[in-house]
Amino acid sequence: MTTQTLLIELLTEELPPKALNNLGNHFAASIAEGLEKAQLIDGAAEFTAYASPRRLAVQIKNVKAVQADQKIVKKGPAVANAMKDGAPTKALEGFARGAGAKIEDLTIVHDGKQDVYAYEYIQTGKPLGELLEDIINQSVKKLPIPKVMRWGSSTFTFVRPVHGLIVLHGGDIVNVSVLGLQSGNQTLGHRFLSGGEITIENADSYAAQMREQGKVVASFAERKAAIQTALNEQAGRLKATVAADEALLDEVTALVEYPVVLEACFEEHFLSVPQECLILTMQQNQKYFPLLDQNGKLMNRFLLVSNLQTEDPSHIIQGNERVLRARLSDAEFFYKQDQKATLESRLPKLANVVYHNKIGSQAERIERLQSIAAHIAKALGADAAAAERAARLAKADLVTEMVGEFPELQGTMGKYYARLDGETEEIAEAVEQHYQPRFAGDNLPNGKVATAVALADKLETLVGIWGIGLIPTGDKDPYALRRAALGILRMLMQYGLDVNELIQTTFDSFPKGLLNEKTPSETADFMQARLAVLLQNDYPQDIVAAVLAKQPRRLDDLTAKLQAVAAFKQLPEAAALAAANKRVQNLLKKADAELGEVNESLLQQDEEKALYAAAQSLQPKIAAAVAEGNFQTALSELASVKPQVDAFFDGVMVMAEDPAVKQNRLNLLNRLAEQMNAVADIAVLGE
């Protein structure tokens, strides 16, 4: 059966730029999936997604004009129950009637268990035109569109008004109706550079015709690559690098159909404003690409992506420079105005900034942050006064003009203003870095003072918000407590602080009775659960569970313990020792009395005497290794007692009739368990 390329295009008004690429990929994949299910393609679909500001399209190779005929087998009642006294039962008659067949037309097939009556027939394949309309409509309905709109007098809804529909199979129009539009082969090109309607000659010629006749690069990926290449070439010529992330590049790609990269500049005096402010306004407000010199300093030149190609782009460049000049003038004004007041003098205004109506204002919060940060700094051996001062100033920039205009600059502007106020560099850096880490993979604060303030900030958020009952549930975490917990854990893995003690200190900083009394224990459990999630990114679940079963309060040696358990698990004795440890723990649960010291005089059998001697020899070795942080050595020592453990369980009845002997054997197993679990609960390995 011959096949041809299928093309579908929805011509729209300007689509949301941040959603464009996702919409295009979903639309193309959904159409391809529908064709596969309809058996209009053999094997996996080979398709290309197109997405530009005014169109979503997909081009799919090797699409059949008609489905292949199919042999259909409808299975009915079992042969054993279908005939009675040589006549068909009601069940068989009903099956034949439902299948539209006569009894004599039925065949007998085996369904894997028994012989059954069946009706076999050939179903003629449907043409593409009969199936495609529903496939397209279903694909449109399944698009990830948070908000839809209506247009004109129609009742149809879509993310933006749709004005045209192309459906071509090879060079032939496939007649379908979608969103109130009848399919055709005509579309529009670039809004300004194209000369009117374009007739697509063939599904395979779409991209070339759009580029040549319509001045549209229809492929999102192709436009993005072209922009990236042009940006790099222009920056290279200026010995600069482009300051931009993937999100900005994607957004700009979604805003243009025929990209042209141009170079522009702004007055040097604006460079007196912190470069973070200038970069943010260029990227966020204007979608420009700032340039950094070889020292990472902002240059007074930038790159922009135009949607127009002209012989003389000077008017485009000048227009963009004029718009940016106004933006930068605003930033310069805010910066100068903010310098008229110190951070310290701004603190009273924080009393009017509500943090949460149940736990007070930012001013009240600062009081807590100061005490928590000073406590943590002392524990870290850092300058407690510097940490307290940084915590006092940490939120002062929230009431500045610049942060009011650009909330993303909170902390950053605090650093600059702290420097201007004569604060030490350590304090200024801590003011900025106390928000770190902001997200997974973000840098940790640099230095102990900054770490103390960052820990205080996140602990106060976690304990305070949790304590008033705003606990994360499912995918709802409006106060980002999970992110705060992960940030705390990442920092604590660098420093030897007691996590439970920090939680209690933070809880005690709130007015008595304000927070739920269970908050310390609940947040500690929450942190433990988040820690498991964090560690399972790098280690198997059973190894993480073994280490965390000990409920470690210090996290700075976690990595060493995890690596040690991973190495222990590879030992030939590991599986047997893990099983023995589990058996020991189960026996210890049956103890009637409090477990204590082993009484050598009550050791009766050679196997228990040998195990006691081995445990006695093992204890100082493991204690010394753990004290020195040599966890792998501590665990590897366990391999030496495997013969004695095996012999003990093979030859000794732990739950002896004599209560004293039984208790003594349980005491022996308890001593063994303490040594086996000194680093981790090895019983859970392999579970």
What spans do the regions from the language model cover?
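Amphipathic alpha-helical "coupling" segments that flank catalytic cores
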Residues: M1-E687
